[in-house]
């Protein structure tokens, strides 16, 4: 169906298209200019036009699509080359000598124009928005032939047919950008006037009136330029294109569309990304980072693995980070890319990194500050046994396990403190970090008194082995100790941050007194790091440090196989168990340890399994660890968690191979590596390790950690601006003054190590193993049906835990306190009492005593996220407004902070202050346009996107990123910012800003829906009784748009 009109625009005769149709209604019609009949035709749709057009005589096919500027449209280019030679009927060929343009140089220029279009597209859309354009997405048509004057004319249309822009202004601006990048001699060939507010553009199969040059598809051209071979007519149409992706608005102020999400590469990730460039950097140098792309400058010609040819001029190399994967791109070929690998924390990063270590393209040794000491203060050698120790005030010894550090220490003690020495009556204190390690040391130094075998003060004993937690039994005296020995010194420092000290203050005070005043100090550790150096320099800086380092690589005959695939690791384990090999399995995950135990028991019921974890009884740990030679000699499989580390050593050659499973959610890399050495001799010297860990963003330097720590306390002294949620210092409390005690400095050093492990767990683990001299390879293997069964067992274990807790005895506060005290003091607690204690803690947390609970209740409400969200909701809804709630929380935490600084600083540093996290979360919410966590208002897409752009362009989210350990988003990408904000709201309150049918509102996450805000207590489930006053709805969205999933119904339950 069609209608015809003489004119397009309105006139007094009523014969124009606009007399009948508004611009809005023309969106759904197809308008054609009929040049032959000098008419405008309006068709109901495109199909009607194609059907009608097919029946028209050839000479009348002079049709042009009418493109209205306000409608979305494809990007298009009209290319015309000047006429060079007349044709006559009897002369079919151009005189090449007189011709300026022939097929070859026309094609060269056309190829140049296509390249520039792709380059500008890359710069405009690929770089900031990760939207790629390939040659196969470019449609090339031609109308080559004789014009009205019988002259040869080259004419082409270039159409980017898979994409559209919002309007003609966007198209015009993009075309201008292309023209700016064309060489001057090419510029005249491109028509700049093809993006007017009303544009006629010739339709495929049509010609101009009086000319036989028909616009057509050209298969030969498509082959030459490697462009699209489509012959679908609708792909050539410009206006309101269907099946296209609408590109972001770049050149106009319209905010209806938003860019696709692409994260910005963080500075902390850049070094890791650059490592993937590897040998490519021989011909390129780093240029800059643009969002998720790393750009390089060419320094010399090189072979391109993507294009399979040499490039010698352009800056073609680009690395793109999508998610955590790193891809290599070439500007000359947008169709292909090479996966280089993945950043830390992703599934195939392990294999990629091991491959780089195997090819020695990675430096695995991490230098420490001790190595920078002058030659007069260090003794470095490479021998299979230890040399004699120096008699110096501060001696630091580094060497791998089983090279004889303790043997040489005994020789040192015999020489300087033996019966024939002048110092035989001098005081010696040997400090250890674990009770079992203390007993192990005593077996080697029988003339020392073990702290646990005597009662009362330890000062009367000249030679004492004492665990860190029992240092309070020593006192400072007028005379310092003569020799202080710190074996496994890094672990000793860790132990001061364990939270297990019953008498922390006196224990740490006596430790620091001995460290600062002892005549001689010896520190020993295979994993010696900068923490020890910094602590010694700070507190024993008046005497020089002497570094004794035996670099002998005892592990050079060991072989490690790494993988990130649990399936590959399990299949190898199963294969070795089927071959009746005896296996050692250390893991830093209690759940994984329990899962492996159940999995192996079901598969191999005849095998004996030794299992040790924090859940093992105190009696079992003490009896077994004191006689591992006997007890471990009875088992086929040995599974243990960090409960076993230094101090427990099995020397017999019983076990064949070690299978380790580690992640970055538990202890640090150094502790994990220590766990590998508890069985000293493996028959095969083979270690098969599965490493897993998500990407984290913890502050890594002492300066950043200190800034973040002080900032959290700083905000407690500031006055909140109710309107802008910003801070000013209170006149009453003033600006805080912090006293940086010895423990404060030790705590900072310990946090640095923990954060490095959380952020770079996989690389640090592999580096430390490779640095021992061990050979590293990638673990491979056949795929068997084990993972589904493994996962099923995991669910069974979790469900049984839920059942045990739900069905446990309901105990009172007195019994719960007794169980807690027994656990703290290492007294064995019955398993049923442990479940009863877990049940009590769960009921106490939600104030849910007196209610019967089910396994499903335990599953839902005993999760970390649900508890964290519940705490956040309770804290933010105590007052009548969020401002009042924030002020109440600030006052509470400030009072605790001031008490802790006066009485027990370690409590302050270990306390999780939450005020600042609330402050940031509410600030983000208000910047989005919502007043509080229970705001029922609805924002349109335009309202929210405008807020995100206007509010966050100048706002630095670094502090918020630090607070929530999240990657900082790109400030120019609203969708990425919203994703970041929703992560914050989800972590703090179990909320998100939800999108539905073009509107945004506050909605519960899955965890948040379990703990609704209510006006008064309900009986059905735990809830948050909120004091927040209702927010008046001010949204312009009609009431009926609130569905059953609206924020009002989800975030506030009336009783």
From Swiss-Prot:
InterPro entries: P-loop_NTPase (IPR027417), Replication_origin-bd (IPR003450)
One Pfam family hit: Herpes_ori_bp
Residue runs in coiled coils: none
Gene Ontology BP annotations: DNA replication
Superkingdom to which the source organism belongs: Viruses
The keyword Iron-sulfur appears for this protein: no
SUPFAM superfamilies linked: P-loop containing nucleoside triphosphate hydrolases
Factors inducing expression: Expressed in the early phase of the viral replicative cycle.
GO terms for MF: ATP binding; DNA replication origin binding
Key words, A-Z: DNA replication, Early protein
Stated family: Belongs to the asfivirus F1055L family.
Described purpose of this protein according to its UniProt entry: May be involved in DNA replication.
Name used for this protein in its record: Putative helicase/primase complex protein
Species lineage: Viruses, Varidnaviria, Bamfordvirae, Nucleocytoviricota, Pokkesviricetes
């Amino acid at each position: 169906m069609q209608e015809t009109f003489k004119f397009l625009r309105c006139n007094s005769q009523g014969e124009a298209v606009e007399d009948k149709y508004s611009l809005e209604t023309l969106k759904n019609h197809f308008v054609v200019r009929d040049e032959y009949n000098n008419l405008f035709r309006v068709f109901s749709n495109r199909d009607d036009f194609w059907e009608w057009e097919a029946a028209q005589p050839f000479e009348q096919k002079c049709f042009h699509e009418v493109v209205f500027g306000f409608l979305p449209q494809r990007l298009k280019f009209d290319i015309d080359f000047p006429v060079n030679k007349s044709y006559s009927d009897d002369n079919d060929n151009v005189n090449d000598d007189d011709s300026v343009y022939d097929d070859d140089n026309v094609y060269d220029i056309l190829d140049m124009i296509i390249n520039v279009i792709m380059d500008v597209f890359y710069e405009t859309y690929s770089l900031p928005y990760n939207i790629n354009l390939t040659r196969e997405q470019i449609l090339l048509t031609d109308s080559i032939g004789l014009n009205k004057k019988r002259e040869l004319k080259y004419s082409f249309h270039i159409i980017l047919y898979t994409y559209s822009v919002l309007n003609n202004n966007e198209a015009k601006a993009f075309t201008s950008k292309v023209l700016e990048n064309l060489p001057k001699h090419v510029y005249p060939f491109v028509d700049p006037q093809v993006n007017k507010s009303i544009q006629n553009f010739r339709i495929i199969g049509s010609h101009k009136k009086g000319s036989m040059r028909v616009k057509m598809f050209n298969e030969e051209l498509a082959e030459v330029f490697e462009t699209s071979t489509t012959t679908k007519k609708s792909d050539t149409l410009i206006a309101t294109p269907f099946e296209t992706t609408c590109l972001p608005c770049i050149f106009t102020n319209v905010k209806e569309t938003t860019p696709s999400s692409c994260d910005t590469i963080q500075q902390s990730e850049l070094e890791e990304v650059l490592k993937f460039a590897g040998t490519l950097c021989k011909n390129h140098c780093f240029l800059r980072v643009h969002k998720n792309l790393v750009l390089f400058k060419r320094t010399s010609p090189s072979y391109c693995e993507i294009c399979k040819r040499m490039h010698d001029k352009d800056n073609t190399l680009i690395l793109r980070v999508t998610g955590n994967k790193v891809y290599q791109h070439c500007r000359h070929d947008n169709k292909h890319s090479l996966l280089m690998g993945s950043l830390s924390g992703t599934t195939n990063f392990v294999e990629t990194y091991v491959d780089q270590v195997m090819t020695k393209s990675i430096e695995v040794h991490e230098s420490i500050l001790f190595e920078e000491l002058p030659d007069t203060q260090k003794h470095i050698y490479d021998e299979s046994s230890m040399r004699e120790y120096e008699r110096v005030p501060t001696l630091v010894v580094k060497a791998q396990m089983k090279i004889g550090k303790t043997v040489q220490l005994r020789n040192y003690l015999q020489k300087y403190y033996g019966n024939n020495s002048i110092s035989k009556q001098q005081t010696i204190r040997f400090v250890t970090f674990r009770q079992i390690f203390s007993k192990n040391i005593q077996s080697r130094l029988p003339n020392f008194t073990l702290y646990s075998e005597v009662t009362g003060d330890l000062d009367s004993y000249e030679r004492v082995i004492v665990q860190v937690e029992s240092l309070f039994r020593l006192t400072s005296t007028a005379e310092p100790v003569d020799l202080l020995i710190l074996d496994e010194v890094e672990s000793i420092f860790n132990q001061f941050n364990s939270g297990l000290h019953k008498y922390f203050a006196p224990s740490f005070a006596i430790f620091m007194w001995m460290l600062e005043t002892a005549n001689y100090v010896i520190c020993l550790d295979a994993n010696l790091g900068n923490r020890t150096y910094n602590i010694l320099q700070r507190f024993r800086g008046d005497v020089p440090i002497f570094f004794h380092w035996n670099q002998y690589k005892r592990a050079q005959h060991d072989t490690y196989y790494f993988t990130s695939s649990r399936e590959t690791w399990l299949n190898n384990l199963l294969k070795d168990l089927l071959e009746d090999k005896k296996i050692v399995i250390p893991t830093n995950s209690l759940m994984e340890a329990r899962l492996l135990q159940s999995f192996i028991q079901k598969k191999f019921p005849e095998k004996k399994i030794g299992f040790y974890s924090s859940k093992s009884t105190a009696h079992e740990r003490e009896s077994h660890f004191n006689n591992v030679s006997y007890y471990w000699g009875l088992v086929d499989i040995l599974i243990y968690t960090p409960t076993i580390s230094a101090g427990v050593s099995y020397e017999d050659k019983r076990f064949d191979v070690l299978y380790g499973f580690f992640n970055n959610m538990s202890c640090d890399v150094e502790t994990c590596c220590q766990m590998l050495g508890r069985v000293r001799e493996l028959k095969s010297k083979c270690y098969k390790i599965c490493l897993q860990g998500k990407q984290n963003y913890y502050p890594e330097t002492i300066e950043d950690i200190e800034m973040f720590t002080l900032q959290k306390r700083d905000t407690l002294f500031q006055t909140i601006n109710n309107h802008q949620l910003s801070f000013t210092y209170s006149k009453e409390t003033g600006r805080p003054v912090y006293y940086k005690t010895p423990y404060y400095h030790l705590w900072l050093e310990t946090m640095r190590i923990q954060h490095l492990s959380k952020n770079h767990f996989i690389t640090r683990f592999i580096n430390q193993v490779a640095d021992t001299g061990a050979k590293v390879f990638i673990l491979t293997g056949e795929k068997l049906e084990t993972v589904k069964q493994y996962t099923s067992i995991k669910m069974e274990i979790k469900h049984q835990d839920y059942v045990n807790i739900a069905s446990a005895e309901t105990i009172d506060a007195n019994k719960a306190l007794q169980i807690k005290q027994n656990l703290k003091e290492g007294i064995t607690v019955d398993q049923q009492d442990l479940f009863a204690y877990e049940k009590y803690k769960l009921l106490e947390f939600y104030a849910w005593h007196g209610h019967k609970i089910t396994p499903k209740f335990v599953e839902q409400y005993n999760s970390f996220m649900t508890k964290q969200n519940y705490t956040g909701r309770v804290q933010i809804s105590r007052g009548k407004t969020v401002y009042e709630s924030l002020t109440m929380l600030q006052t509470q935490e400030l009072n605790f902070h001031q008490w802790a600084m006066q009485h027990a600083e370690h409590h302050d540093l270990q306390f999780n202050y939450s005020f600042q996290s609330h402050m940031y979360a509410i600030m983000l919410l208000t910047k989005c346009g919502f007043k509080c966590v229970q705001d029922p208002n609805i924002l349109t897409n335009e309202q929210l996107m405008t807020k995100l752009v206007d509010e966050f362009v100048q706002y630095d989210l670094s502090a918020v990123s630090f607070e929530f350990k999240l990657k900082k988003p790109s400030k120019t990408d609203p969708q990425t910012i919203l994703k970041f904000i929703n992560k914050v709201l989800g972590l703090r309150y179990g909320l998100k800003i939800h999108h539905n049918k073009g509107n945004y509102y506050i909605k519960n996450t899955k965890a948040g829906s379990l703990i609704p805000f209510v006006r008064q207590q309900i009986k059905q489930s735990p809830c948050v009784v909120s004091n927040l006053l209702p927010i008046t709805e001010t949204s312009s969205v009609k009431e009926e748009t609130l569905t059953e999933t609206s924020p009002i119904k989800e975030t506030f339950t009336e009783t």
